């Protein structure tokens, strides 16, 4: 009996002859509202503001962005002679700046330009499974870039001997002939993607600013432009049964509702060193460590946007290690080697980088992610869990707050041209609690 000490009693399911089925009685109705921008100016560079109307008896469950656009060459429609494509993640990258405020006081988003474009790209790449590829392509034109090297995914859809970037070629088919393309994406903020609905009578304002054409397009020149023809938000609400709604309001009057979410943040570290070995210290402000961090190297001109570069391809490197309070995070640095393919010298065996990434995003036991061995050259990054138990991004609990010094060492590699003007991109997740009271006061705790 020792082996079952501490175990709980159980009855086999085939003996439960009178077990019932749960009945949903709390939600009376689900409905959606289309929210159009306050101004009709969609392409003049100003912010497009959306005011989601508060509902007295319904709770906000989800917000989606629907955007219709066309790509043209000047004022002319595209022809078969034009080699142009949209970048990946266009449904989110369309907006260079996204601002979300609650009750006109609490700002929820990072204010840095293009932070939303990169955060959503990382979100999709790290959290979506490969078997969602067809859905993401159909709904949001999200198709991963491909090619042997980073250069293959940079600009042109076609390059001499044929298609180099098949992902870009697939996206180019959507815009051929300057036909109208409509894409849909959830509003990417943890407060709007959590399983909990927001209370009634919430005043929410969302501001979207269109990104630069040079950031959004892959082409051989700046002759092309992208115009938004229509845009609206779809806000979905749940209306509880009056009895449950009253119970919720009574509880809120006594105790604020807690939303345990994460705060995504994109940190940029300019790299001033011109040598092969990069060393950076004190990566996080105040020494406070995030729950997880993903490291990639990018060129400054790619981050700000240029038609002849791809913002969503990163620069590979030879080795990586992070020291926390002087202790190496990896017993041996993550390293790769080189090989020659199609006459080009490229990074070869990257399995330990991919293995580390899959462990942090919890894909090591759950199948392939959007980033895999076929496109890792374009999406070269390192995932690190800095939680006390080194748990992955899907861990559904808070970790102890940790403070530590950090020192990063990256070897860019041998015999490769080292680009100037490099940036270290760090995509972080921080634990955050948002409390909403009965008077709809919002408190953020980190």
Question: Where do the PLM segments sit?
Answer:
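Short, low-complexity Pro/Thr/Gly
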Residues: 1-446
């Amino acid at each position: 009996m020792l082996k079952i000490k501490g175990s709980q009693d159980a009855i086999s399911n085939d003996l439960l002859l009178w077990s019932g089925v749960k009945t949903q009685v709390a939600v009376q109705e689900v409905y959606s509202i289309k929210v159009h921008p306050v101004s009709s100016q969609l392409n003049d560079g100003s912010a497009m503001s959306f005011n989601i109307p508060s509902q007295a008896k319904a709770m906000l469950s989800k917000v989606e962005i629907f955007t219709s656009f066309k790509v043209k060459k000047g004022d002319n429609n595209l022809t078969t002679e034009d080699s142009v494509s949209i970048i990946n993640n266009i449904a989110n990258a369309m907006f260079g700046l996204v601002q979300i405020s609650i009750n006109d006081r609490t700002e929820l988003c990072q204010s840095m330009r293009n932070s939303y474009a990169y955060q959503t790209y990382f979100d999709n790449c790290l959290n979506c499974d490969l078997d969602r590829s067809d859905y993401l392509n159909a709904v949001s034109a999200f198709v991963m870039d491909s090619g042997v090297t980073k250069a293959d995914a940079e600009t042109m859809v076609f390059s001499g001997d044929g298609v180099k970037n098949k992902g870009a070629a697939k996206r180019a088919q959507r815009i051929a002939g300057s036909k109208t393309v409509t894409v849909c994406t959830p509003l990417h903020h943890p407060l709007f993607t959590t399983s909990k609905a927001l209370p009634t009578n919430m005043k929410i304002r969302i501001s979207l600013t269109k990104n630069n054409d040079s950031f959004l397009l892959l082409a051989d020149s700046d002759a092309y432009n992208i115009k938004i023809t229509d845009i609206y938000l779809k806000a979905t609400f749940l209306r509880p049964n009056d009895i449950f709604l009253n119970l919720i309001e009574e509880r809120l009057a006594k105790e604020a509702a807690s939303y345990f979410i994460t705060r995504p943040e994109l940190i940029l570290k300019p790299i001033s060193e011109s040598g092969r070995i990069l060393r950076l210290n004190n990566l996080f402000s105040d020494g406070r460590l995030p729950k997880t961090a993903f490291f990639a190297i990018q060129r400054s001109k790619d981050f700000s946007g240029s038609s002849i570069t791809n913002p969503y391809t990163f620069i590979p490197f030879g080795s990586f290690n992070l020291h926390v309070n002087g202790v190496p995070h990896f017993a041996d640095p993550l390293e790769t080697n080189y090989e020659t393919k199609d006459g080009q010298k490229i990074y070869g065996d990257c399995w330990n980088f991919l293995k580390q990434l899959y462990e942090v995003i919890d894909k090591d036991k759950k199948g392939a992610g959007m980033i895999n061995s076929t496109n890792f050259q374009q999406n070269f990054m390192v995932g690190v869990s800095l939680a006390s138990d080194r748990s992955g991004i899907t861990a559904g609990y808070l970790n102890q707050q940790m403070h530590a010094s950090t020192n990063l060492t990256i070897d860019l590699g041998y015999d490769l041209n080292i680009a100037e003007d490099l940036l270290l991109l760090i995509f972080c997740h921080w634990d955050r609690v948002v409390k909403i009271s009965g008077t709809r006061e919002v408190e953020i705790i980190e």
